[in-house]
Amino acid sequence: SRGEICNITDSLQFISEKASTFISNWHTRIYRHAPRLFDAGYQRAESHEDIFCEGTPIYKLLSSGAERMYQYIRSAGYDNIICTHVFPALALTEMRRQHPCLQLVTSHISTDYTCAPCTADSALDWYFIPSTSLLGEFEQCGLQPQKLIASGIPVRQQFYQRVSQEAGKANAGISPAHQHILMM
């Protein structure tokens, strides 16, 4: 919004193109077509957060591209890295462990209304969270309160524009006579 340029990169590609395709495709397939399986996996991750800790097989896989990530960031001269998922946050944490002299500002934007499993296993400068009502939850998960910023979730400007109910229904393909409710 202030004219800053932001490049978007798939952090899983630093592991490998095949790993990125595999992880992304299966993640999407499971949550779309097997939501109960996705929920079970998420609940398992919540109750066994140590599966993402440094030294575990999952951590080693997710952070295995840390050196390639470092080379990419260094060669492009980036000074601010923003993660929108915990997987790149873990890889970035490992990269910073391996290269502590690299001057960067790092942050994570939590796009869930909860502290996702393994968020606290990352070590970034800032954590942007959706609401002040979640400060306690993120602190309870192990994040330092001075690193938490309740900023809301960034959305496109068009979502701030009010439209009439009739226009909204027409835009969404909902019959004007249809009674509906949106729950979040």
Whereabouts are the PLM-identified features?
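A conserved, positively charged/aromatic
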Residues: 101, 117-127
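Short, well-ordered alpha-helical microsegments
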Residues: 16, 89-91, 114-117, 135-136
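Glycine-rich phosphate-binding loop signature in dinucleotide/nucleotide-binding domains
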Residues: 72-79, 174-177
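A nucleotide-sugar donor-handling region in carbohydrate enzymes
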Residues: 125-184
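Conserved N-terminal ligand/cofactor-binding loop architecture of enzyme catalytic domains
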Residues: 3-75
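A short, Lys/Arg-enriched amphipathic alpha-helix followed by its capping loop at the start of a domain
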Residues: 1-4, 100
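Active-site proximal beta-strand in glycosyltransferases
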Residues: 80-85, 89, 93-112
